Amino acid sequence: MKLSIFFVLFFIAIAYCQPEFLDDEEDEVEETLPVAEEGRERSCITWRNSCMHNDKGCCFPWSCVCWSQTVSRNSSRKEKKCQCRLW
């Protein structure tokens, strides 16, 4: 009797969980797509000398931000740095 109850519950659990396995496979496919886009975004977020040549809209939807900074503490020479940023 206990064995038959066990098998009934076992098969109910399998039947109940089966759609979940299919959902997991669909989620895995959806999760791989943003990874490719994320790799492109990482290559776009680099230091630049200007925002003039924003290759293939790398900064979109972000913006390219530029500023000047001194090369070292004792130097008066400044260099321009640009970077894609969310803010």
UniProtKB/Swiss-Prot annotation:
Signal peptide annotation: 1-17
Protein origin, superkingdom: Eukaryota
Keywords assigned by UniProt, alphabetized: Calcium channel impairing toxin, Disulfide bond, Ion channel impairing toxin, Knottin, Neurotoxin, Secreted, Signal, Toxin, Voltage-gated calcium channel impairing toxin
Presence of the UniProt keyword Signal in the record: yes
Secreted keyword on record: yes
Tissue specificity comment: Expressed by the venom gland.
GO terms of molecular function: calcium channel regulator activity; toxin activity
Protein name: Omega-lycotoxin-Am1b
Subcellular location: Secreted
GO terms for cellular component: extracellular region
Disulfide bridges in this chain: C44-C59, C51-C64, C58-C84, C66-C82
Job of this protein: Modulates Cav2.1/CACNA1A voltage-gated calcium channels (P/Q-type currents) in rat cerebellar Purkinje cells and hippocampal CA1-CA3 neurons. At saturating concentrations (>10 nM) decelerates activation kinetics and slightly increases peak amplitude without affecting deactivation kinetics. In vivo, does not cause death when intravenously injected into mice. In rat models, through its activity on Cav2.1/CACNA1A, has an ameliorative effect on memory defects provoked by hyperstimulation of N-methyl-D-aspartate receptors (NMDARs) in the hippocampus.
